[in-house]
């Protein structure tokens, strides 16, 4: 890694409060990834959309930001990162869905709670000349940020990095929807109308959205049980940051609240753990400690110990 790039990466590591040894992770796993993206972008006839899919706590947003840095600093590409979280429906729109379809749709997260039309419009705009406003969602208010607070950039860009917990997940078969997967579904979706609605969205408008992904990277958790542990770890870190800043932390979730919250995501997370590896261009197998154990490129049977090139 050249000195200027190493300095940029070390600054990124400090900002993200990652361990210093993460610089070796970048050199081993993610510099080759950026080089592979460059090769794809060089032959693409449009703005390349790189998808990063993975469960909660898997490191999607960190990798998305890092990949944009590498593409810019190392390879000179114009790149921007987006999260599917930025395209949530407004709180009022979700409340309407909760009244018309199912109360669980008031909670943001699952397919059916995003503005897919806005997401597709944004992707199209990033591939055409002009100023583009990037939507932002304020999780503290559980609502879309005012448009005047959306950052803008000059398009077209070479690469869009889109990350999300359910990105590229395929719909389930109807038979798989019959039995509840957890207490939330058993008690609050006994008839199955919520999970059927969510699955219909995956098969419908979300399929068009996910089809825009040209190159899919999967951060593969070892199991769903680890997802809860990772999400709890995120909550603990947030509590520490709030305490250090002298804030009350009233928005933090206690363990029962967090467990219920994650149950909204459990069905599609489990399904993605099984279905996505066969569809991803690159799969990073994660350890329980959230380090990379191995990399596989191009579907099953293509393991690599140190590179995606």
Tell what function each PLM region has:
Residues 69-80:
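Post-Walker A helix-loop "phosphate-sensing" segment adjacent to the P-loop in P-loop NTPases
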